[in-house]
Structures are given as structure tokens and as C-alpha cells.
Swiss-Prot record:
The gene is ffsH. It comes from Aspergillus flavipes. Pfam families: MFS_1 (PF07690). Residues 21-35 have a biased composition (Polar residues). This is MFS-type efflux transporter ffsH. Residues 1-18 have a biased composition (Basic and acidic residues). MFS-type efflux transporter; part of the gene cluster that mediates the biosynthesis of the cytotoxic leucine-containing cytochalasans, including aspochalasin C, aspochalasin E, TMC-169, flavichalasine F, aspergillin PZ, aspochalasin M and flavichalasine G. FfsH might be involved in the excretion of cytochalasans.
Amino acid sequence: MSEAEKKASQDAQHKEPMADSETQLDSDSAPSSQAEKPAKTKYPLSFWLAFGALCLTGLISAMEGSIVSTSLPSIIAELKAAFQPLYGQLADLWGRRYVMILATAIFLLGSGICGGANSMDMLIWGRAVQGIGAGGINMLVDLIICDLVPMRERGNFIGLLFLFVSIGTTSGPIIGGALTDNTTWRWVFYINLPMGGAALVLLVLFLQVKWKKELSTRDRLKRIDVVGNAILVGATFSILYALTYGGTRYPWSAANIVAPFVLGFVGLGIFIAWESNKRWCPYPVMPLHHFNSRTASASFFISFMTMILAFWVVYFYPVYFQSVLGNTPTISGVHLLPFEVSFPIFAAVGGGLVSKTGRYKPIHMVATSIVTIAIGASSVLTQHTHKAAWAVLQIFIGMGLGSLISTTLQAVQAGLPESETAASTATWAYMRSLGTIWGVSVPAAIFNNRFDQLSGQLDPSIRDNFVRGQAYEHATAQFVQSFEPATREVVIGAYTDALRRVWLVSIAFGAVTVLSTLFEKELTLRTELDSEFGLAEKKGDAKGDVERGEGQNDSREGGQNENV
């Protein structure tokens, strides 16, 4: 047996027993070791340079997601979800540095194709390439932070990263509008090239991290789960297609919506069967034993629901501002600032609390409860509601969702060994990305269905403008204000009623998320970094670049395992 084959056998044996030898911890109290505040890790300049490059790359990717006109098919942009597990597998085989540089280069290539597009087909293909690159960036920045920072302290840096991501998300529409008004639409894409180019240079110069080089290229290629990735991409694409066009371009009952839905979920079933077969799939792209841990499973679900509820707010508060209050898109964006500002602030606060206390379950329970109450209370908003009411509600929603976004990854990884960081981060990113498209499609379906029920109140001469998914498309102040006063009041009343249904249904989604936190256990967050992909060591420095404080726990034995 060759050395590579021996290594492969050892790796496979190392991963399988994880979920069966779990040490059960009290779910209601933190382990005693967490009560002691660990020594603060000191990070060298090389770490901060690498972290700065990651933040800039994350900012550009986030800005791309909000700068581009929503008229482009969202299925293209959301295709990135399907490739994130593959990026995780590639990062384990070829190291984080090269895969991160590759993802950034793919993103820039897609931006260049879009900017130079001379047809809609070329633009759509460019967006597909750009989205695949963005998906890798979004997953890899979190993964690399996990490689460079002990688990106990990751919340601090993930929260800081989300500050940059939120800057990109918030500034995107403003920059996009300014570029479109003063130059050409092509600069909406070209602007990524100088900024992304600078980020790429920083990554090449400062992202100097270790990686395993003992395998040959041939052995690495054998470890790529080609079949599993292909099935997952196909199944994800089918579901995204149905969610994107169902209720808008086609009725939900149409065969060309039902068929992709069925094929997508059948595909996911086949994917699960493939990944669980050790003979066919010795190196799964998404190890299913991660879901044997009830804490990891609950945290994956909370991550998915967090993004659903976040996009629920991001897409339907503007509908309220424009169709009910009569705000312009610009003013609507300003009115969304309480959420957009509170979200990253509390992402940093939530991450900091986990780092300080070593506990994530209480934060998840409180945060999900706050979100459920605040998003449900949005159902009382009307044309005459004082602006302080919707501003405060947004702040509370941002408080809850922000606290969740920066703390669920630690809960996922607490019961897993460090060797599975890439796979668990990729699965976490995949769940979050899926949540974004469900977070638009589900409330849109509820909204349009309710508006169809209310269409009988409208004058027959205008009714066709609001049925079969058109109510959401026409939710603009310009359109609503175009009617005479009496008709306008009826239309505004219908929008208010449809939005009320959207917010009331959101309570059920929030309540399920609250209940899911009860399945989490409070596992110890490791305070010592033990990664094979940390900062590259300097010559003569066996300890590497990161200076560690005294009294840190050894994590080389892998993650804690909990009895399910």
C-alpha cells in the first residue's frame, strides 16, 4: 500500500467514529472550563494583514450582491450556494490560499464578462461566473478565520467581518445608482475590477497559510466527490429555479414549476443516499455524520432560518415603505437603515459575548425570541404608524439576527474535530445561501396569494395590475400614487392587509427557530488553535506566527462529541 493510500485510510477511519463516541454535556449549564476567562491571544502583524485582505474581499463580494439591478434573474446570483461545498473540499486538498485566490479570480473574471457583455445571454453567463466566485469568497473568508483564530475567539472576528460585509451591502445600491446615473451600467460591474484587483494582490502578498502537500495531484483529484457535487448542483439548481419563477413568471401549480421542485427534492434524496454510502463515496463533500450531532443539526437549521428571516425583512419592509407610506426607493433605503446598522453592530456584540462567556445557547434563545416578537409585531404597521415604531422594530430585528449570524458557526463546530472545519463551514455556508432564496420566495408567495384574495376589493379596471404575482412587482410609490385618491386608498389598504399576512406568518417561522435552540447543547469552545492550515511559520519558529496565551486547552484530540 502506498503512503498516499495509507494516509487516505487513516483519514477515513478518523472521521467515521466521530458521532458515536460523544461526551454528553449538560445542556443548561456551561462546562466549568468556560467560566474561566482564557488568556487573550496575541496576533502578529502578518495575521492582521491577512485578515484585512479577507475583509476587503468580503466587502467587495457583498457589494456585488446589492449593487446589481434586481431585474437580472436571481437564480443566477444564487447559484453560488451549489458550489460552496465543493470549495470546502478543494480547500482541504489544495489549501486555503490557492482556492481563495482562485475564487477571487473567478469573481473578477465574471465581473469583466458582465461589464463587456454585448448580449443578455453573455450578461447572464457572466453573472453565473461571478456568482460562483462570490460563493467561494463568502465561504472561504469564514473558513480561513476559523483556521487562524481559536474557536472561543472566532465570534469577535466573524462579527468584525460582518461589519465590512454590511458596509458593502449598504453602499452597493447607492454606488450602483450613482454609477448608472452618471456613467454607464457597465461600471456597475467594472467597479469590481480595481477594488477586487487590490484585494487579490493583498491575498497573494499576505495570505500566507500552511497546507498539506504530501498527496500527489492524482491522489487529490481522486478525493474530489465529483458525483456528489454534480448531484448537489443539479438538485440545488432545480429548487432555485422553482423558487425563483414560481408565483411570478409561472403559477405555482404549473408543470414547469412543480417538476423542478420534485426533481430537486428527489435529487437531494439521491445526494443523501450517495453521501452515506462509504463504498461509493469514501470522501463525501458533505459528511452526513455532522448531522448526527443534535447541536450541529440545530445550528445548521438556525443558520438557514436566520437568513430566511433576514431576507424576509430586507425585501418586505421596503414594500411597506414604498407601497403604503409612498416613499421613493432612495428614501425607502434610508428608512431601512435601523436594521442595516443594528445588524452588523449586534453581529459584533454577539460574537464578542460568545468569546467572553464561552456560551452560545443563551444568546441563540434570546436572539430568536427577540426576532420572533419584533418581526411579528410588524403586522401592526399601517399608513398612519409613527416612524419611531418601525424604526424600533427594525433595531430589535437587527439585534436578534445580527447576534445569530456571528455565533452559529461556533455551535456547529464545537462538537467536531478541527480536521473537519472546511466541510462543516461549507455546509453552514450552503444552508445560509439556501436561506436567502427561500427568504424571498416564501414571503413573496404569501404576499401574492393574499393579494389575489383581496383583489375583489379593487376596481375591475385596475385588478389585472395586481393579480398573479404583479402586486409585488408594482409595489412602488410611483405606481400606487398614479391612482385617484379614492382608488389609491383602497390599493394602500390591500397592500397593508397583504403585508399583515406576511408578518403574521413569519411568527411561525420565528417560533420554529426558537424551538430549535432547545436542541442545542452547551459544548466547550476550544481555546487553543490546532489547525493544519494556520499562518505559515517563520524560519526557526516552531510555534508559528501566532503567539498564544498561557493556560489554553489542548484541542488536538478533536471535537467534543455529544450523545444524540
